[in-house]
Amino acid sequence: MAMKRVLGYLKHTQDFSLHYKKYPVVIKGYNDANWITGSNEVKSTSGYVFTLSGVAVSWRSFKQTCIARSTIESEFIALDKAGEEAEWLRNFLEDIPYWPKPLAPVCIHCDSQAAIGRAGSMMYNGKSCHIRRRHNTVRELLSSGIIMIDYVKSKDNVSYPLTKGLSREGVEKSSKRMGLRPRTSCHNGNST
């Protein structure tokens, strides 16, 4: 059944493409996690989307490699992975000779206020070593100015469809926010 849905999606979106704009050249990240929802599942799902000038340049949806014992642990694992990708993207842009320097921190939008609060905390009081390591990584990325974390409502989180099932309208809305448009609308002089 899932394969039929994927094939149907591909069939109906073959005339769509990502439309990159020239300005403003700002990189933003969005991350989300879906803690174990089904009784047969043991691992949570993470997802992130990074946009450049409002158009997706990097995205990923994946099962987490360790078992999260709570929603906040699941969100923090997702935030750690998004932080790794943000650091890679920022380093990539810094290596481009004509890219404006210095680069601003990559803003990662997260819909978990608890994870945002934990990220800014100097102490991790949990007992899980795998979460402590991720906390230290995120805290280091924050303190070194590579990333900053900001709250976004779930309904405005561009990465939301990578971790949860959405209605057709939800998928269409999220696709537009990632810069996916019909090919006929790409020649308005502002896209490349």
What kind of region is each of these model predictions?
Residues 11-18, 37, 57, 144-150:
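Short helix-interrupting loop/turn segments at helix-coil junctions
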Residues 15-17, 26-28, 47-49, 55-56, ...:
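Conserved active-site beta-strand-loop modules that form the wall/rim of enzyme catalytic pockets
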